[in-house]
A protein has these predicted regions:
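Short helix-coil transition sites and intra-membrane helix breaks within transmembrane domains
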Residues: 10-19, 91-98
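Membrane-interfacial helix-loop-helix
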Residues: 1-5, 28-100, 104-142
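Hydrophobic alpha-helical bundle signature of multipass membrane enzymes
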Residues: 20-24
Length: 142
């Protein structure tokens, strides 16, 4: 279970990971689905909150040459985020866009409790779907 927590946490940061595959593998090995869901959701939510913290911290360096986003790019991202609002964090589960959304929430200083709630809902839903699909499609193979 600790390995699932770590893989889920790393998968939620800007580092690559394969938490869905590991979750399905542990389910096939007979681990309880509810426990797998809770551990993966907690790890992935914590990883998302690490991204929020990185966004909050990184904003102070935006004038540095090495900062990864241009002033125009950051302004464009802020306009997009303000247009769709904090509810866009419900897409934090999605590959490619989810991690940058959590960083952007930090850059724009979304209150911690709201970031935590929205990210937890998104990540929990993601792993519920993964477990449902594993139970439906992988059961004959396990």
């Amino acid at each position: 279970m600790l390995s699932l927590f770590v893989v889920a946490l790393v998968s939620a940061t800007l580092l690559p990971g394969g938490s869905e595959v590991w979750l399905a593998r542990l389910w096939c090995l007979g681990e309880p689905a509810a426990m797998l869901w809770a551990v993966a959701s907690a790890g992935n939510t914590l990883g998302g909150l690490i991204n929020v913290a990185l966004g909050r911290y990184a904003r102070r360096f935006q004038e540095r040459r090495w900062f990864p986003a241009s002033r125009e790019g950051l302004a464009r991202a802020e306009r997009w985020y303000r247009r769709f609002g904090e509810w866009s964090l419900l897409a934090a589960w999605a590959p490619v866009v989810g991690d940058p959304l959590t960083v952007l929430a930090g850059v724009l200083r979304l209150p911690w409790w709201r970031a935590c709630l929205l990210i937890a809902v998104a990540k929990g839903a993601r792993y519920a779907v993964v477990l449902y699909l594993a139970q439906r499609w992988l059961a004959p193979l396990c």
